[in-house]
Structures are given as C-alpha cells and as structure tokens.
Amino acid sequence: MGQYYKIVNLDKQEFLDTYTFNDGAKLLEFGCNSEGTLTALAILLADGNGRGGGDLHSENPIIGSWAGDRIVVIGDYADEQKFLTVDQIAKHKMLKDGEDPNLYDHAVEHFKDVSEKALIAMLDDQFIYQVYEKAD
C-alpha cells in the first residue's frame, strides 16, 4: 500500500488530485514526473507568467491563482487536526460521530478539486498537449 497525497491550498480551500495528471498518488510517483501534478502546481503558483520565453502562454485565470497562498502536500496518514481550524474540526466531529479529522480527508470532502481547470490551462502549451495526446 503506502501513503497517498493531495496538494491542498488552505486559503482557497482547493486541491489538486494527482490522478487527473496521469500520476500516481504516492509522493515519489508524482514528485519525480514531469508534465503532471508538479507542473500544475507550478502554474497555479506562478506570479508574472506570460512575460518571457518558457512561460505558459495562456490567459487562463487559474494561472497564478495560488500565488502567495498556504499550500500543503498532505498524506492520508497525516496527523489528525493539523492545519484545520477549530470550526472545521467541530463540524467534522459532529458529522462523523466524534471522529478526529485530518486535512486529507477534510479536503476531499469539503474543498474544491481544481485539477481539471489546471490541466486545461496546461494543455494551452503545445508540448504538454502533445504529451497528453500520446498518452490517450
């Protein structure tokens, strides 16, 4: 088995799901791959994109939308309650018979998955588009 991860934006309450990018969910499955999850993360964090060679030339508003936010690469074995607010913990406990939440489970249940939006922006790049076209 092993631990599975998601990339979570605490401020926007959004996350990236590695499977959308044809990556595995274990840390080194997506951490060592190119044109996948970490490219999506770079696009979301990019501040000033589109001003030079090597940038993603797209007007997609998701580009840079995570710049400056608190981001966590969180595993499903993560510490309970860590990174969650008191209100988030209380809500979870109320809905789950007192069970302590972790951020991974909370994000899956309550945050927005922006993986497809990030992938659409990535596909504006011809090279990345060709990589995904070959994979299908």
Regions found by a protein language model. Name each.
Residues M1-N22:
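Short, extreme N-terminal segment that most often corresponds to the first beta-strand
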Residues K26-D136:
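Low-complexity intrinsically disordered segments
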